[in-house]
A protein has these predicted regions:
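Short terminal alpha-helical segments
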Residues: 35-69
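Amphipathic alpha-helical binding modules
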Residues: 117-156
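Short, Lys/Arg-enriched N-terminal segments with co-localized hydrophobic residues
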Residues: 10-34
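Amphipathic, non-membrane alpha-helical segments in soluble helical-bundle scaffolds
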Residues: 36, 57, 77, 134-137
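Aromatic-anchored, charged helix-turn/loop surface patch used as a conserved interaction hotspot
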Residues: 60-112
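Short hydrophobic targeting helices and cationic amphipathic motifs
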Residues: 4-7
Length: 156
């Protein structure tokens, strides 16, 4: 995620701090770098789901692929932040709410999936709503809502 220059600076600082035996500072720097990588991996994993899931609409697949292409072309922190913000802006308002899934199960799902499958879907979604779920749990909606929640744009 960071450019080589950034990593060189961090490595130099770690070496400098190590010479002063400042283990708390070294540990703090390592934790920040690990957290940064974990967040990048979190976004990358969900972008991968959005780009390939059968439940994703084409424009969602395109937005996720654009994120992947952008960070592959320029993995500097600034470029990753811009690409991630663009993806999050696109995703806002897209995950289907639990009420939307329930309405689907009560109506169109009956024709598309049959009465029995729609009834099972409805039962499962009503149970999820009762347990506090706010969004659809299909792979695309789950990935999108997890990303939006991670960046504080929605609450799960």
């Amino acid at each position: 995620m960071s450019d080589p220059g950034f990593l060189e600076v961090v490595t130099t600082w770690i070496a400098l701090l190590a010479s002063y035996n400042d283990h708390k500072t070294i540990r703090a720097i390592k934790e920040v770098l690990i957290m940064e990588k974990e967040l990048f991996d979190y976004v990358a994993e969900r972008a991968g789901v959005l780009a390939t899931a059968d439940t994703s609409k084409q424009d969602t697949k395109d937005a996720a692929a654009a994120w992947k292409d952008a960070v592959a072309a320029d993995n500097s922190d600034a470029a990753v932040e811009v690409a991630t913000t663009k993806l999050l802006d696109f995703l806002e308002g897209r995950p289907t709410t639990i009420d939307g899934v329930i309405a689907f199960a009560q109506g169109p799902a009956k024709e598309m999936m049959g009465e029995e499958a729609a009834a099972k879907m409805l039962e499962a979604q009503l149970a999820r709503k009762e347990a506090g779920a706010k969004y659809c749990n299909c792979p695309s909606c789950a990935a999108a809502s997890e990303l939006l929640a991670k960046f504080g744009r929605i609450e799960l």
